[in-house]
Amino acid sequence: MKHKILLVEDDKDIQEIIEYNFSKEGYEVTKCSDGESAIDLVRHETPDLVILDWMLPNLSGSEILRQIRSSKKLKKIPVIMLTARTEESDKLRAFDTGADDYITKPFSNSELIARTKALLRRVSEDSFTDTLNFHDIELNRDNKRV
């Protein structure tokens, strides 16, 4: 299954580079370049992961992140901030708002892909449950009890 990545980046050159590299790795990439489009896409397409620039037209990346984290449906989507903001205070603010990772520009495509794979792997592992339920029967896989 292809993972769906939402790339929110207003620099078209960076968009193209990321889309090219992620497509080569088997990801499906949807791109947008402003905050309002990002909110619309994340709500209607529910990506597996969001790569989010901070400084965007219409709505900042931190505000988009805040809206994602405040939505019951969307709050578990992993978000990687990809931004030119390099100050420690910016990084801390992003993590406090709910970013899962933070990468500063200029960046390595290989590192961005590796961090994406790691986040998606962790999210996939967390989605498995220790119990299986069927009608009134519950099987606990950890302690092997019914």
Predicted feature residues:
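Short, Lys/Arg-enriched segments at the junction into DNA-binding effector domains
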Residues: 3-4, 118-146
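The feature encodes the CheY-like receiver
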Residues: 15, 57, 75, 87, ...
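Charged docking surfaces used in two-component/phosphorelay signaling
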Residues: 16-24
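Active-site residues of response regulator receiver
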Residues: 53, 83
